[in-house]
Amino acid sequence: MKIKMKVLQVIPRLGYGGAETGCYDLAHFLAEENCKSFIVTSGGELLKYIKKKSVKVFRLPVHSKNPVLIFFNSLIISLIIILYNINIVHARSRAPAWSCLIATKLTMRKFVTTFHGTYNFNNKFKKFYNSVMVRSHLVIAGSNFIFSHIKSYYGNFFIDGRRKLLVIFRGINTNYFHSNRIPISKIDNFSNKYNIDRNKFIILMPGRLTNWKGQKLFIESLKLVLIHENSNMQPFQAIILGDEQGRSVYKKQLIDLVQQCRLGKFVKFINRCDEMPIAYSISNLVCSCSIEPETFGRVAVEAQSMEVPIIASDIGGSTETIIKDKTGFLFKRGDVNNLANTILMVMQKDYNSLKSIGLEGRKNVLKKFDVNKMCSTTFAEYKKLIELS
């Protein structure tokens, strides 16, 4: 008798990040495959887009690292598993993963984790806390970079063969991130709202405001670009787009740095954009300047899907998602001069060259990083787990 798949995904918040959109996309994909799809989360902006007839959502404080709440959550998740006869529980962050580990042990169900980051650890306790992400039956790495990280630091968990580790590249919705599907009216409204001069060369740096994303490096590179640009080049307008997420001190540092570099007329801050394809569509160039490795590098993939040239640090997932000098460019991590020179090089390219890079970028994403490929591969692995039950 064929078992109907019922999958419960657990994530701290269902916001606009890579892990969150992956959870959202997979939940609806499973529903379309005639599976029962459930999500446990504490809240988040994407909740309003959930199709309630397809995906059932439970609100729990799974964002909390409090041991008492982690245990409380494990009991409630156990009840959900039993009441809805869940086959597979898929955790996407450490605190909820501990709750899921306890719940799946109690109910004897299959446990899956997606390893979304390198998770810094300074002591044995922190490494133990992080290790929950490799205590599942199936561990999914979002890139070869993360796969290597897991093997290096947690390889002993896979020696006995009881756990499976594999790479499933994250995917994006290429129909959503499509340059031909954005109404001109939305582009005009966005440009007018933020006073963006589209006659200038628009350089976009998306990402939440945090030091490791490299906003300071980006600003310092623009100072050099301004010094070295020539009269034949189009004047530029840079946009730093990202939520400060409570880091008001860091944002003030960025604003002060812009003034120190005399870039007040050239750099604009935008807190957020609920429709990122609009922001990409007005841009001539996208920069991802992380000084620490990205697990996957979602910005690089979204930019390519939107046919916009991308410049990214030569570390982490971006080295796998960008075909160097064909779909985008890589600069030496933390090297302000190398970044500035790369920006200048792109700014000096003609329209046809930039268009060609954009077209190659979209081909690359359609081939390797489409959301349906990510979801179908994950679904196939789920089925294998159930067949082993």
What is the predicted function of each stretch?
Residues 20-25, 201, 205-227, 252, ...:
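A conserved mid-protein helix/loop that constitutes part of the nucleotide-sugar donor-binding site
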Residues 39, 309-312, 322:
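Short hydrophobic beta-strand element within catalytic cores of glycosyltransferases
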Residues 39-45, 172, 206, 237-252:
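Glycosyltransferase donor-sugar binding loop
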Residues 91-97, 115:
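Short His-centered aromatic/hydrophobic patch
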Residues 136-167, 172-179:
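A short, active-site helix/loop in glycosyltransferases that binds the activated sugar's phosphate group
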Residues 192, 345, 353-368, 374-380, ...:
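A short, well-ordered alpha-helix in the C-terminal region of glycosyltransferases
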Residues 246-251, 263-273, 279, 329-330:
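Active-site donor-binding acidic/aromatic loop of nucleotide-activated sugar
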Residues 324-325, 329-336, 345-351:
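Conserved acidic donor-binding segment of nucleotide-sugar-dependent glycosyltransferases
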